[in-house]
């Protein structure tokens, strides 16, 4: 009986030691999965823009309970306010199937939401929450801006758990995504 209690105590101690690292392992695997889905969605958006012969917009959002992004098209008009389709923004916080509700001329293609409880977030790396894929070139498109300076040449998106466990997906001007990460072991991508 004493031997059994010693074995149970040893197993309990080993479980307490292994549980935190197992939780960390699960979070990193979830991060890898979310980033893989993000890259796939960006490639899908690029090909959809070309196949639909229409800009395909990508818009990001966040609140306390989630981060999200939505892919959508907008019927471009000749009115000055919507010449490039840039004044209509679907809201991924509304949820899949409802992100473009009430947005004139907008058609939702895909919406992804990540609950804050999952510990993984997806958000733009810098200011700005949207861009489009051009249907002619397959490259990225930014609507004209009145701000001074050269136009952006890429759009970077972070998929992260924390500052030490982050993937950065960069959509280059050509529309192709590339992925790098921080120096954390186990991420398996080049260091940014």
What does each of the following model-derived ranges do?
Residues 1-27, 41:
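N-terminal single-pass transmembrane signal-anchor helix
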Residues 17-31, 36, 47, 55, ...:
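N-terminal helix-rich module
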């Amino acid at each position: 009986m004493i031997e059994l209690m010693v074995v149970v105590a040893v197993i309990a101690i080993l479980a307490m030691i292994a549980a935190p690292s197992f939780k960390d392992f699960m979070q990193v695997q979830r991060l890898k999965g979310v980033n893989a889905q993000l890259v796939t969605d960006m490639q899908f958006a690029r090909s959809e823009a070309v196949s639909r012969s229409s800009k395909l917009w990508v818009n990001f959002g966040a609140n306390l309970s989630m981060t999200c992004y939505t892919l959508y098209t907008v019927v471009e008009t000749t009115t000055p306010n919507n010449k490039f389709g840039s004044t209509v923004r679907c809201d991924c916080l509304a949820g899949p199937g409802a992100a473009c509700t009430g947005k004139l001329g907008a058609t939702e293609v895909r919406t992804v939401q990540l609950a804050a409880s999952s510990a993984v977030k997806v958000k733009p790396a810098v200011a700005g929450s949207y861009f489009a894929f051009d249907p002619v070139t397959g490259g990225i498109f930014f609507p004209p801006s009145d701000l001074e300076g050269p136009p952006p040449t890429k759009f970077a998106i972070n998929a992260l758990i924390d500052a030490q466990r982050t993937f950065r997906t960069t959509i280059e001007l050509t529309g192709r995504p590339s992925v790098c990460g921080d120096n954390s072991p186990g991420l398996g991508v080049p260091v940014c």
